[in-house]
Amino acid sequence: MIAVAAAPGDRPLMREAIGEVFRTTRHHRSERISDVARRANVSPQYLSEVERGVKDPSSEIVESISTALDLPVSDVLRQAPRRIDTHQVSNFLPVAA
C-alpha cells in the first residue's frame, strides 16, 4: 500500500486550528461559551464562530479570548500548528499499489 496526502484544501486552516484550541480549552475547563465571551468582550455567537473556524479573528481578538481563558497567546500559537500537522497526518489516504 502507498500513502498519498489528501488534497491541500482538506487541511485545516489556521483559524480552524486556533478555534479548536479555544474550544478544547473551554470544554476541558467546563466553561460556558457565554461566560468566556463576556470576559473576552465578544458576543457568544462570535466566539462560537471563532471556535468553529468560521470567523478569522484578529490578533486583538485572539489576545482577548486567550486572556478570558487564562491561556497565554504563545500557547495558542504553539498548539494551533500542531493541530494542523495532526490533521495532515490523519489525512493520508491508503491507496492499493
Model-derived regions, located:
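N-terminal flexible/basic segments that precede or flank functional cores
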Residues: M1-E20, P94-A96
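Short basic helix-loop element that most often maps to the first helix and adjoining turn
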Residues: E20-A37
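Short alpha-helical DNA-recognition segment
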Residues: R32-S48
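The DNA-contacting recognition helix of HTH DNA-binding domains
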Residues: I33, P44, V54-K55, V73
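Hydrophobic micro-packing sites on short alpha-helices
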Residues: I61-S66, V76
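Short, charged recognition helix plus adjacent turn
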Residues: L77-A97
